Amino acid sequence: MTFLFQLALAALVILSFAMIVGVPVAYASPQNWDSSKRLIFLGSGVWIGLVLVVAALNFLVV
């Protein structure tokens, strides 16, 4: 269970760093907004899901 928690936490951190860089770049380029909008919403949904998974696993591990 601890390994799964660490894996989910690492995925959350990596996705957070990717979105910190990617979202401002996507907002700064108006010509690709249609394709970027879908990617931003997908990344946001995955991020929220990972936060909930990490919270649940943290409850089970500790």
From Swiss-Prot:
| Key word Ligase present | no
InterPro entries cross-referenced by the UniProt entry: PSII_PsbZ, PSII_PsbZ_sf
Q: Where in the cell is it found?
A: Cellular thylakoid membrane
Keyword annotations for this protein? Answer: Membrane, Photosynthesis, Photosystem II, Reaction center, Thylakoid, Transmembrane, Transmembrane helix
The keyword Disulfide bond appears for this protein: no
Could you name the domain of life of the organism this protein comes from?
Answer: Bacteria
Q: In what way does this protein cross or attach to the membrane?
A: Multi-pass membrane protein
The UniProt entry's GO biological process terms, in alphabetical order, are: photosynthesis; photosystem II stabilization
Q: Name the residues that span the membrane.
A: 8-28, 41-61
UniProt subunit comment: PSII is composed of 1 copy each of membrane proteins PsbA, PsbB, PsbC, PsbD, PsbE, PsbF, PsbH, PsbI, PsbJ, PsbK, PsbL, PsbM, PsbT, PsbX, PsbY, PsbZ, Psb30/Ycf12, peripheral proteins PsbO, CyanoQ (PsbQ), PsbU, PsbV and a large number of cofactors. It forms dimeric complexes.
Q: Which HAMAP family match?
A: PSII_PsbZ
Q: What is this protein called?
A: Photosystem II reaction center protein Z
